[in-house]
C-alpha cells in the first residue's frame, strides 16, 4: 500500500525536520505536533537562510497555509 503524506509526517514526530515556507523562509527544529491542515509545532526551532542559522526560537507554530514542504532531516 502506498504511503500517505501524513504518514511520513507522523513518523517524523519528535525528530528533526526542515519546513520550507512559500515565501522562501526555512525553519529547522524538532516536530512536536501537527494537524490535518499542516499547521506544525516545532521545538528548538531555527530560521535558516543560505544554509546558516539566522535566528533561534524556542517553540513556534507555523500556519499550514504557509507550508510548501516538510522534510525529515538526515539522521
Curated annotation (Swiss-Prot):
UniProt-listed SMART domains: Sm
Any GO BP annotation: mRNA splicing, via spliceosome
A Pfam family matched in the record: LSM
Taxonomy, superkingdom: Archaea
CDD domains: archaeal_Sm1
The entry's keywords: Ribonucleoprotein
InterPro entries: Lsm6/sSmF, LSM_dom_sf, Sm, Sm_dom_euk/arc, snRNP_Sm-like_arc
Gene Ontology molecular-function annotations: RNA binding
Chain ranges of the Sm domain: 4-75
Gene Ontology annotations for the cellular component aspect, listed alphabetically: ribonucleoprotein complex; Sm-like protein family complex
Stored PANTHER family: SMALL NUCLEAR RIBONUCLEOPROTEIN F, SMALL NUCLEAR RIBONUCLEOPROTEIN F SNRNP-F
Family from the record: Belongs to the snRNP Sm proteins family.
Protein name: Putative snRNP Sm-like protein
Organism: Pyrococcus abyssi (strain GE5 / Orsay)
